[in-house]
Amino acid sequence: MIRIFFLSLLSCVLATTSQAQSLFPVSPHSFHDEPIDTAVLRVVYRMRFIPDIHQPKQKEEQELELLLGKRYEQFRFNAAGYGKEISKPSGSGLNIPEEGLAASVFIFDKHLGHRQTYVKGIAPSMVSYTEKEASPQWDIKAETELIMGYTCQKAEAKYLGRTYTAWFTSDIPVSSGPWKLRGLPGLILRVTDSNREYQFEAILIESNLKNTIFIMPVKDRYTLTSRKKVNELLKHMHKDILQAGEVINGRRPQVIGSNASVISVPYNPIELE
């Protein structure tokens, strides 16, 4: 299975196409049946990002959802958006792209003040790490803007190597937002980094949920590691996918029609430090 995955991956890398495509499709996360919380607010964000900084006009989009419960917050790929966001090669099961944040799940425990992150597609098993909450140190500005009918206020912060401009609304008094961006006196509805390589914008806010949405713990088996190690693995994987295949499969993939000893793919992570 892994060998087939990497041969498919390499064929994508070597192929010449006019459109961007996912180079590392992985299966979606699976979740336990027993919930850890019930969502009282659901926010869907559209994330636009540039996978290759050398081709800034080629942007990709993903829909991700933020589920807020009394104790837990979960940020993940939007299950309802699968029809638009997934790739499903002929003869295969459901796949999601590794690029961006689709292959990651973030669960924040507001009581303990820590976040657990799960990442698929970079090791034989899923990897996970836990970190103490370290929200951006926001500088709140006086400027306001109307977004989705809400009056939003501007804030700026440097965080994990990028400088962000966020717009939050105190009309929804929850100190949350997309990905790891939180800590403002209101929900973040829009946020963009200074290079416009990553942009999040809320496209749906549901507070009176017609159907109960549970926040479920991740079921997949995982290896516990650190954020630094995960970022190093991701960087190395993109730098040399042949060696990455050897690590995961136990032997180096053979590429028909190519004598290349190293094959690299573009890598523009949201975390730069």
Name each region found by the language model.
Residues 1-31:
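Bacterial Sec-dependent N-terminal signal peptides
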Residues 22-273:
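Extended soluble regions of mature proteins
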